[in-house]
Amino acid sequence: MRVTIVTMDSHLSAAAARAHRALAKQLPGLELTVHAASEWGDSAAALQACLEDIQRADIVVASMLFMEDHYTPILPALQARRERCDAMVCILSATEVTKLTRLGRFDMQAPQSGAMAFLKNLRGKHKEGEAGGSKATAGERQMKMLRRLPKILKFIPGTAQDVRAYFLCLQYWLSGSDANIGAMVHFLVDRYAAGPRASLKGLAKPPEPREYPEVGLYHPRLRDSAHSGGMTRSLDELPSTATTGARGTVGLLLMRSYLLAGNTAHYDGVITALEARGLRVIPAFAAGLDARPAIEAYFMKDGRSSVDALLSLTGFSLVGGPAYNDTKAAEEVLAQLDVPYFASYPVEFQTLDQWGASDRGLLPVEATMMVAIPELDGSSGAMVFGGRGSAGKVACSGCDHRCTFENTPDSHDMHSCIERADMLASRMGRIVDLRRARRADKRVGLVIFNFPPNAGNTGTAAYLSVFESLHNTMTMLKQQG
């Protein structure tokens, strides 16, 4: 039995490898391969290996393939394999990919079935005049419905059972720990293995999707039997190192999927660096790509901010993700929070040593997703703080440390850049100090137009009274201390 997973989420590779080892005893002869779309841009061999695995896979899972550069190279291979494999599950992807889903009698290319019509009725409609703030809970409502649907569909015979399987796969994936990735593969094999592979059915019962906090907190020193993956829902359970910083408090936003996959070294480095600067750190996460639930739960109290600065390490916009963003919603929550907002990012589509040796630095897709889009929300101070390692022993030339971010082949583990994490912590410390300083102790620099220089252009601007505005601004600053 050959199962191939193709996804943008390179950080799931190590989790899938652990899942494969756990499944080896339950499903003898299982081959599980994972391919990260982020590798194809600079590695023709990686793309070719993916195409070959798709061509011989018995079950194919495709996820997070919404960028044309990611799905276009493999779309013909997926289309060719669709009718020849036991099952194909395509989730959270572009329409061209998603419609290739085929699970038993559930075919997304077939005319709408009774089961799908039933699901549309369950979905409900947005009521006209409904408060705009309700959008903040849209993701929460969708997750509740996702958990509820398999329970409802369980009692409907026929195609509905295959539709139920599709939604169970979504549940497994969205809580993508190694346990859930393994359970998803086990579930698909147990239900859809055909021909000589059918002997694998019924060897062991696949577990139900394991649930994890959808909104919560994380800390690297919170790893014990009571806190799966270092996660908790309670501020009181954070270790003392995270709560005793007298200098000030930084609210940290993390990606839940990295925490579930156990791929957190890049986050751990930043958390440690911030704490070493005497800062209290509250590392929070939310399911999906809407950070508002985490902000409201852990960074605000009685409608007011309880942090001195907000730092996002997700690499995405505050509300939305790589495929879309809701700038207006982000502006609303940031105005309510009213603290400096910074967005830093790991390099996702190249390794750290490739980035360090590059004259260009960020790739165009990284500059767009991780810098430009978050800046539309109001973020500033964009900088790299970590990224993927390399399978080869290549020293990163991005700074004088010349670190070797070595990974085992195909693990795609993340790492923290020592110099960058320390620089980021230093900047956040100074921002917190500035926010907490008395107004009389703050120094403000004003820069006005003067180009080209030495040509009498100082403070010139069409239809603007630059010097009058400057004088009024300075007068108001003095009046306010």
Regions found by a protein language model. Name each.
Residues 1-481:
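An N-terminal assembly and electron-transfer interface module characteristic of large anaerobic redox
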